[in-house]
Design a protein with these regions (language model features):
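Rossmann-like NAD(P)(H) cofactor-binding subdomain of soluble oxidoreductases
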Residues: 1-47
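Long, compositionally biased stretches enriched for glycine and/or charged residues
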Residues: 50-209
Length: 209
């Protein structure tokens, strides 16, 4: 792998977060991002929008941590039109636990469902990758959940971040419930284990261009 020393490198290959850490280690000085949970967050919003009959553009909901089964859904801050999802469910007499179980399963295993139905799942990740590239090229300063190295956890994982021409300009760690914060810690642990497995495999040494 070759990269310019001032490049912003976006890792798309599944599993993107551990591979972003490998890229960061093998290309020192390169700004490395992973697509992380951006696509998962979009799917989270779409599913919530469908459930409530609302345009996903007006749904505020994020998935953080690992792009994988240990990802964390931020239900405590999920809102539609500024109204907490928990309050909307209470008005309808619905239980959040039931919706949560079904929706999280659908988002976590969306790729498998799509592949079974269409024999391909590249379109969603292709769209979000192109969108991230636009944010960087146009210095949009957009705020999205995206994977970047988090010194606090020792791995690349997704948190809401300001994205511009130099990659992640600032990480905006959101308010979380105790359960969500513990989920993020466990997600980081899972990523550390995955990174250890990747590191244990032989690979060619990368050089900078």
């Amino acid at each position: 792998m070759r990269a310019e020393s001032n490049a912003v490198l976006l890792v798309v290959t599944d599993r993107p977060d551990p591979l972003a850490d490998v890229a960061r280690e093998t290309c020192p000085g390169t700004l490395v991002l992973s697509t992380g949970t951006y696509l998962d967050s979009q799917r989270f919003r779409v599913h919530l929008g469908k459930h409530f009959g609302a345009d996903p553009a007006h749904v505020e909901a994020q998935v953080i941590g690992d792009h994988g089964t240990s990802q964390v859904f931020l239900w405590s801050s999920a809102r539609i039109g500024g109204v907490p999802v928990a309050a909307l469910l209470a008005r309808r007499g619905e239980r959040i636990d039931e919706l949560r179980q079904a929706l999280e399963r659908d988002v976590r295993y969306a790729n498998i469902t799509i592949i079974e139905g269409h024999d391909a799942s590249q379109y969603g990740i292709g769209i979000v990758s192109a969108r991230i590239a636009e944010m960087v090229l146009n210095d949009e300063r957009a705020v999205i959940p995206i994977g970047s190295y988090q010194k606090k956890f020792g791995v690349t994982l997704s948190l809401p971040s300001i994205v511009g021409r130099r990659g992640v300009a600032e990480v905006l760690e959101p308010e979380m419930s105790d359960e969500e914060r513990e989920g993020l810690r466990k997600s980081a642990e899972a990523l550390n284990k995955a990174l250890h497995r990747v590191r244990s495999k032989p690979r060619e040494k990368a050089t900078l261009g």
